[in-house]
């Protein structure tokens, strides 16, 4: 049995196309009408949904706003079993570049970052992972999933994009034979304002070090600005979210 599940509290982006897809695939919507508190909402919603599922039920989770069902899902279970794993993550497109993406999220395998926007697995193992993800201090679900790859040997990444394909904003070619396809969302001011404080926690020491070096090297007339930047960085270190960089 294969079920497709998403988490969406409203209709936005590609949501209507996902629900009213061309292949008659029923998509279970979690979280509808609720207030969004953060990425952990998805893990909590999925865990609650999984409680009534049989261990061997196969659940496909997709992003509600960016995902398209590209073809029939009739062979998905067979394709998944051929991967010889219990949980399969989609491959991240590394929009921010390989080094920055790896620095923030870590890698699931030696070469690939798993993407939390699309993944699938058996209900038993997904329940185990969602419980762990919720208990982790980090507020970012993708970071948590990649860290869990180091804990469990039953997780793999769809390295060849056979079931899942994530396109990046710079991809000119968007044709694929994958079953589930994710297209980049609009990088508007709201998304940037959310992303900067979430991911700046991985770079604040780098920024502070650069400010200190520039304060020592550049002319006096530029130092007030650099000093201000350094003070802002220190303020961030003290008060801002560092849930993913401090071990609990």
Residue ranges: model-predicted function:
Residues 57-65:
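Short beta-strand-to-loop acidic/aromatic patch adjacent to the donor-nucleotide binding site
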Residues 64, 71, 121:
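A conserved hydrophobic position in a structured secondary element of the catalytic/binding core
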Residues 27-36, 89-93, 157-163:
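A generic structural motif
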Residues 111-207:
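Catalytic core and acceptor-binding pocket of nucleotide-sugar-dependent glycosyltransferases
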Residues 1-58, 210-247:
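N-terminal anchoring/stem segment of glycosyltransferases
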Residues 14-17, 45, 75, 125-128, ...:
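Acidic, Ser/Thr-rich intrinsically disordered and amphipathic helical segments
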């Amino acid at each position: 049995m294969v079920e497709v599940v998403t988490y969406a509290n409203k209709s936005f982006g590609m949501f209507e196309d996902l629900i009213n897809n061309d292949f008659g695939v029923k998509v279970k919507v979690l979280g509808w009408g609720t207030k969004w508190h953060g990425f952990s909402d998805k893990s909590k919603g999925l865990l609650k949904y999984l409680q009534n599922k049989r261990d061997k039920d196969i659940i496909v989770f997709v992003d509600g706003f960016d995902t398209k069902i590209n073809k029939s899902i009739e062979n998905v279970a067979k394709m998944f079993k051929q991967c010889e794993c219990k949980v399969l993550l989609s491959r991240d497109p590394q929009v921010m570049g390989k080094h920055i993406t790896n620095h923030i999220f870590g890698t699931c395998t030696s070469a690939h970052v798993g993407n939390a926007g699309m993944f699938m697995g058996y209900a038993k193992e997904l329940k185990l992972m969602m419980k762990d993800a919720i208990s982790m201090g980090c507020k970012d679900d993708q970071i948590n999933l990649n860290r869990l790859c180091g804990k469990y040997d039953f997780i793999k990444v769809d390295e060849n994009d056979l079931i899942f394909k994530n396109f990046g904003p710079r991809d000119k070619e968007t044709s694929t034979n994958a079953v589930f396809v994710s297209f980049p969302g609009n990088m508007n001011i709201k998304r940037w304002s959310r992303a900067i404080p979430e991911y700046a926690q991985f770079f604040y020491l780098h920024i502070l070090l650069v400010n200190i070096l520039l304060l020592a090297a550049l002319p006096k007339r530029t130092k007030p600005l650099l000093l201000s930047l350094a003070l802002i960085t220190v303020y961030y270190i003290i008060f801002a979210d560092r849930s993913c960089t401090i071990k609990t």
